[in-house]
Amino acid sequence: MEFKNKVIAYCKERNANFLDFEKYVSLIEEHNKNINLTGFSGESLWEEGILNSLLYMNSSTKDKSEIKILDIGSGVGFPAIPYALLRENNSIDIFEPIQKRVDFLNLVKQKLTLDKVNIYKQRAEEFSQKNIYDVVVARAVGSVKTMLMAAFHLVALKGEMVLIKGPKYKQEILEAQEILSKLKVEVIVDKFILNAKENFLVRIKKLRNCPKEFPYSWKDIKKQS
């Protein structure tokens, strides 16, 4: 249980309640038996699910307080729920389009008393409000180009979209150049190691309001993918 022990140590360093993480993992394992919620189980649930989510979110938010965060396509709650258990003072919204996962996330919210987490059955590109969130994250949801087209309108001015990517991140940024050229942004790439694997945080800071065509419809996003 190497990675579970790492989460225990992580919680001790930050005065977080590890028992909440155990309850969360138990809920995932219990409900995953009957509903296909995630492919993670056992040790990979602690590594790829919990620990990686904590490292990703802390790097994305830089330990800021009193900020508004959006997690797109959260599934069973990665990366938002582990971070919410660690940092209870930040407001977190989750957009998840699949009903069975929405139901599970609402159960987790209730069982773990996550009052500052809100779950919506929602696709990002269908949400018309703009300039809302200080940090928008998405893990294994879509390419840089897709995420910009679908969700960059949700990022507040001076806020950031932060996407975790592997070694092919340069190709994704290159493929997104046409969309990036329509925006005024600052793109910064931070390299960091997750469990001996090289990962990259692509941070896209909004410096000006998005043009009117944002967000693109899912039909247009698929056409340009």
Curated annotation (Swiss-Prot):
Superkingdom of the source species: Bacteria
GO cellular component, one term: cytosol
Pfam families linked to this entry: GidB (PF02527)
EC number, UniProt record: 2.1.1.-
Function: Specifically methylates the N7 position of a guanine in 16S rRNA.
Family under the similarity heading: Belongs to the methyltransferase superfamily. RNA methyltransferase RsmG family.
Protein name: Ribosomal RNA small subunit methyltransferase G
Organism: Mycoplasmopsis synoviae (strain 53)
Originating gene: rsmG
